[in-house]
């Protein structure tokens, strides 16, 4: 039994061991079919079809305003925070349509963590930042919380840097450390999927490298979907890449193929810098 459920059973509607039909010998974690999304009268996503594999890094690239961030925010339904949003189509997560209004968004966010563009630690201690999620899910035992905090900080490759200052305010960390703390906070709820929306765009090159190395470690246990403007980053760290343009998926393939032999001229034009 995991640390998160050792103190109190967390009730969810999704079975973490559900299996989907394999694609390239992988199981599908998200299967998006005929997704359309509007902000009011603006048609932001158009007929999106993507099958995203488990325990891979999937990069979403494309110019500003192409729908990258909108798409990733549909995967945990954060996009619904915009009052004028409406959608058609389906997004199945382990066989369940998350866009169905009967689907509990709280359950989804237990399985799907999110890391944002700018580090956003809570105005709390380092310890409390990581313990917050487990506490919300009913974990009260101090020993169990201590174990979760250490495991999560180790998973985010920041334990050795903060183990002697856990009671200090998280705002005292550097930008790169804050982002890794946010990743640790995400890991503490034991998600299956980690969504990353431009997670290194506000960081210096050294901190960016640390995050990229961490992503490669995390994909052994998690499915990672990352939005990035940095095409070199996408080429370095992802297994699959989707190129978005004007709200559409132009091309989705193995990253090596996208960057060396794209099948669509628009993809080649974008990655070669002819526009964007």
From Swiss-Prot:
Cellular component GO terms, alphabetically? plasma membrane
Compartments it resides in: Cell membrane
One MF term in GO for this entry?
ATPase-coupled phosphate ion transmembrane transporter activity
Q: Among the record's GO biological process terms, what is one?
A: phosphate ion transmembrane transport
User: According to the UniProt entry, what is the EC number of this protein?
Assistant: 7.3.2.1
Query: Which CDD domains does the entry link to?
Result: ABC_PstB_phosphate_transporter (cd03260)
Tell me the domain of life: Bacteria
Query: Which InterPro entries would you find in this protein's record?
Result: AAA+_ATPase, ABC_transporter-like_ATP-bd, ABC_transporter-like_CS, P-loop_NTPase, PstB-like
Domain named ABC transporter is located at: 23-271
Q: What is the protein's major site of localization?
A: membrane
The record's section on PROSITE patterns has:
ABC_TRANSPORTER_1, ABC_TRANSPORTER_2, PSTB
Q: Where does ATP bind?
A: 62-69
Keywords in alphabetical order, please.
Answer: ATP-binding, Cell membrane, Membrane, Nucleotide-binding, Phosphate transport, Translocase, Transport
* Pfam families membership: ABC_tran (PF00005)
Q: What task does this protein carry out?
A: Part of the ABC transporter complex PstSACB involved in phosphate import. Responsible for energy coupling to the transport system.
Family from the record:
Belongs to the ABC transporter superfamily. Phosphate importer (TC 3.A.1.7) family.
Summarize subunit and interaction data from the UniProt record for this chain.
The complex is composed of two ATP-binding proteins (PstB), two transmembrane proteins (PstC and PstA) and a solute-binding protein (PstS).
Q: Supply the name of the protein.
A: Phosphate import ATP-binding protein PstB
Q: Which organism is it from?
A: Oceanobacillus iheyensis (strain DSM 14371 / CIP 107618 / JCM 11309 / KCTC 3954 / HTE831)
């Amino acid at each position: 039994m995991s640390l998160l459920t050792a103190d109190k059973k967390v009730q969810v509607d999704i079975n973490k061991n559900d299996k989907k039909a394999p694609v390239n010998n992988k199981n599908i974690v998200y299967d998006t079919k005929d997704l359309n999304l509007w902000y009011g009268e603006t048609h932001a996503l158009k007929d999106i079809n993507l099958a995203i594999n488990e325990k891979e890094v999937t990069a979403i690239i494309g110019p500003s305003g192409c729908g990258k961030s909108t798409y990733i925010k549909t995967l945990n339904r954060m996009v619904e925070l915009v009052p004028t949003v409406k959608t058609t189509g389906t997004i199945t997560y382990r066989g369940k349509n998350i866009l169905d209004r009967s689907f509990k968004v709280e359950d989804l966010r237990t399985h799907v963590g999110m890391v944002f563009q700018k580090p956003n630690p809570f105005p709390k201690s380092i310890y409390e930042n990581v313990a917050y999620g487990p506490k919300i899910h009913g974990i009260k035992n101090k020993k169990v919380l201590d174990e979760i905090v250490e495991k999560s900080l180790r998973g985010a490759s920041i334990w050795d840097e903060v183990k002697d200052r856990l009671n200090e305010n998280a705002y005292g960390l550097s930008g790169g450390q804050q982002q890794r703390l946010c990743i640790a906070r995400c890991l503490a709820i034991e998600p299956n999927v980690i969504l990353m929306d431009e997670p290194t765009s506000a960081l210096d090159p050294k901190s960016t490298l640390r995050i990229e190395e961490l992503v490669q470690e995390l994909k052994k246990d998690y499915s990672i979907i990352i939005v990035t403007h940095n095409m070199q980053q996408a080429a370095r760290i992802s297994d699959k890449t989707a190129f978005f343009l004007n709200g559409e998926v132009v091309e989705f393939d193995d990253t090596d193929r996208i960057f060396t032999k794209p099948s669509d001229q628009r993809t080649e034009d974008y990655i070669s810098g002819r526009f964007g």
